[in-house]
Amino acid sequence: SLSDKDKAAVRALWSKIGKSSDAIGNDALSRMIVVYPQTKIYFSHWPDVTPGSPNIKAHGKKVMGGIALAVSKIDDLKTGLMELSEQHAYKLRVDPSNFKILNHCILVVISTMFPKEFTPEAHVSLDKFLSGVALALAERYR
């Protein structure tokens, strides 16, 4: 679970990188579909699933909107992300193992876009936070 120190580190990092969340989302989703091509199955209804396509950009923005919501609900991710959990479990039917894949891509992108801000301490806290987000999103799968 997240300590107060972790929560403070995530909030501090987000305050520095949040304004770039659309670019982070686009890059992370683009990276995911290239490195983990099996994830494209969830986007087969899109006309263009290439990295940086309008659909990828739009969904990357949505994903990072969810991350922003999670930052604001950091004290109770399970309750705060219940609607998103229900949507992913019942409507979108996303295999929850994919949350971990996307989390890894988000970490990679943030580390390359913000090397100064992405200290080892920020890395640990953000990794724990994203793991908590994945767990909260998987809640409705049980």
Curated annotation (Swiss-Prot):
Binding annotation for O2: H59
Binding sites annotated in the UniProt record for heme b: H88
CDD domains linked: Hb-alpha-like (cd08927)
Stored Pfam families: Globin
Residue stretches making up the Globin domain: 1-142
GO CC list: blood microparticle; haptoglobin-hemoglobin complex; hemoglobin complex
SUPFAM superfamilies the record matches: Globin-like
Primary role: Involved in oxygen transport from gills to the various peripheral tissues.
Subunit structure: Hb1 is a heterotetramer of two alpha-1 chains and two beta chains. HbC is a heterotetramer of two alpha-1 chains and two beta-C chains.
Note in the entry: This fish has three hemoglobins: Hb1 (major, about 65-70% of the total), Hb2 (about 5% of the total) and HbC (about 20-25% of the total). Hb1 and Hb2 display a very weak Bohr effect and no Root effect.
Protein name, per record: Hemoglobin subunit alpha-1
Provenance organism: Trematomus newnesi
Gene that produces this protein: hba1
